[in-house]
Amino acid sequence: MSTPAYKRILLKLSGEALMGDDSYGINRATISRIVEEIKEVVDLGVEVAVVIGGGNIFRGVAPAAEGMDRATADYMGMLATVMNALALQDAMRHIGLVSRVQSALNIEQVAEPYIRGKAIRYLEEGRVVIFGAGTGNPFFTTDTAAALRGMEINAEIVLKATKVDGVYTDDPKRNPEAMRYKTLTFDEAIVKNLKVMDATALTLCRDQKLPISVFSIFRQGALKRVVLGEDEGTRVLP
């Protein structure tokens, strides 16, 4: 068995990653494939925590949110992430992967409240911890939640799973000559305004020297390759 490059990781999954080819919602085949890839990493002995977004669900109600108070819309988005967290947990249960959902909003009937010490203990016991409801505060993205939770649980790296296999010099869909960065420094990413994470999350990770890896969750085996330290995606380093 190959030796992982990291002992504990924070995986940031966008809600859109769960849609597959659908326009919104949760695609069952897609979520099943994603949790199988997470299981491969857990089987390597890696401790895995997940922060999940809510765009796949919130997209369906976004037209109704136009003109809505920003804080109210953000709370709706947080609730969408809890729905995704429960869907992830259910998919994990089907393949024998033990997980716990912790929510930054108090919803005790469906999820534990976020408690840092408990989350770390679950990770040490080999359970996957799924963080829902972002930071629990409006005006902060789930990227920022990923950076924050990554620091709190002492993760060695934040893995941002996207639709693109890394960070490019330009949009690869529009410019076929766009080049993928293998590595970047935080300062380079900020100065060049590269779409790694939002500015708050990027600055948090830079200040705490927490590396980020950006990769495509749609490339079979990409998550495992990143964890093994192979040339996959883009790494953003202090």
Swiss-Prot record:
Keyword Chaperone among UniProt keywords: no
Residues where UMP binds: 54, 74, 135-142
Gene3D superfamilies, sorted: Acetylglutamate kinase-like (3.40.1160.10)
E.C. number(s) listed in UniProt: 2.7.4.22
CDD domains: AAK_UMPK-PyrH-Ec (cd04254)
SUPFAM superfamilies: Carbamate kinase-like
Name of the protein this chain belongs to: Uridylate kinase
The species this protein was found in: Methylobacillus flagellatus (strain ATCC 51484 / DSM 6875 / VKM B-1610 / KT)
